[in-house]
């Protein structure tokens, strides 16, 4: 996962604990989880939406009939 080993994850966790404190950590993680869930939901909703067919206007085609001069 992102090339992070166990020691790197432990160091990151300790830094997060120092910054936010043990009391706020569950709230911060819950908010982060809701954000990720909302992001995934939005991405799936975009994939589920039917693609609107592209309507191309016909180019100004010249008449194939020969015009009498």
Swiss-Prot record:
HAMAP family: TatA_E. Keywords: Cell inner membrane, Cell membrane, Membrane, Protein transport, Translocation, Transmembrane, Transmembrane helix, Transport. Part of the twin-arginine translocation (Tat) system that transports large folded proteins containing a characteristic twin-arginine motif in their signal peptide across membranes. TatA could form the protein-conducting channel of the Tat system. It is found in: Cell inner membrane. Belongs to the TatA/E family. It comes from the Bacteria. This is Sec-independent protein translocase protein TatA.
């Amino acid at each position: 996962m992102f090339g992070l080993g166990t020691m790197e994850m432990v160091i990151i966790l300790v830094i997060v604990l120092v910054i936010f404190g043990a009391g706020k950590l569950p709230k911060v993680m819950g908010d982060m989880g809701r954000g990720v869930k909302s992001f995934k939901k939005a991405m799936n909703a975009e994939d589920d939406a039917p693609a609107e067919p592209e309507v191309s206007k016909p180019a100004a085609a010249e008449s194939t009939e020969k015009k009498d001069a």
